[in-house]
Design a protein with these regions (language model features):
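Active-site neighborhoods and metal-handling regions in enzymes and metal-associated proteins
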Residues: 1-179
Length: 179
C-alpha cells in the first residue's frame, strides 16, 4: 500500500503545480502539506513513511491551500478497498452529514442550524458528532470567524449572511463524541 507520506507528496506537488501554497506546511509548526487521519485518528494526522494504507482502512485527507491570497480548506474520507459494513456506513453517513450541513447553510439562517442538521442525521444513523473540533471561517486567514460546530440548536449562533465563507467539516464517530 501507499504511505501517508506518499499522499502528502502528491498533495504538495499538485498544489505547487497549480500555483498554490500548501497552507498547513509550517502552520504552527505542522510539518506537512496535508493532514492524513487513519481509522481512529479523528483529524490532524501527520503524514509519515510508517503509516501504510491497508485494505479495510478509512482515511481522511484534509488539504488547505492558499491561492491568490485566499485560503481554501477541504477534506474527504475514503475507504481503502473492501471494508466492514459499519465502516462503509460511517463514511457514507459522514458524507451525508456534510451535504445536509451545506443544505442547512442558508442566508439569514444561523450557524446552529448547520450543527443541528448534522447532529440529527448522525444520531439517527447511530453515530455521534465530535464536539471538541469544528469548522471555521476561511478567507484571508486560515481560521476566521465563525466557528461552525457540528452539533447544536436551530436558531442559535452567528447569523449567516451572503458572502460568508466557512468550512463545514463534520467529524462523525462510532461510539461517543469524544476524541
Amino acid at each position: 500500500g501507499m504511505s501517508t507520506l506518499g499522499i502528502d507528496k502528491l498533495v504538495y506537488e499538485y498544489t505547487k503545480d497549480h500555483g498554490g501554497i500548501p497552507a498547513t506546511l509550517g502552520y504552527e509548526g505542522f510539518p506537512k502539506s496535508c493532514c492524513t487521519s487513519i481509522n481512529e485518528v479523528v483529524c490532524h494526522g501527520i503524514p509519515n513513511e510508517f503509516d501504510i494504507l491497508e485494505e479495510g482502512d478509512i482515511i481522511n485527507v484534509d488539504c488547505t491551500t492558499i491561492l491568490d491570497g485566499y485560503y481554501a480548506d477541504a477534506s474527504r474520507m475514503f475507504t481503502i478497498g473492501k471494508t466492514t459494513p459499519q465502516k462503509e456506513k460511517l463514511v457514507r453517513v459522514a458524507k451525508e452529514c456534510l451535504e445536509i450541513g451545506m443544505e442547512a447553510a442558508k442566508p439569514f439562517g444561523f450557524v446552529g442550524d448547520i450543527g443541528h442538521a448534522i447532529e440529527k442525521h448522525a444520531k439517527k444513523n447511530g453515530f455521534s458528532v465530535v464536539r471538541d473540533l469544528c469548522g471555521h471561517g476561511v478567507g484571508i486567514e486560515f481560521h476566521e470567524e465563525p466557528d461552525v460546530e457540528h452539533f447544536g440548536k436551530k436558531g442559535t449562533g452567528m447569523l449567516l449572511v451572503p458572502g460568508m465563507v466557512f468550512t463545514i467539516e463534520p467529524m462523525i464517530n462510532m461510539g461517543t463524541w469524544e476524541v
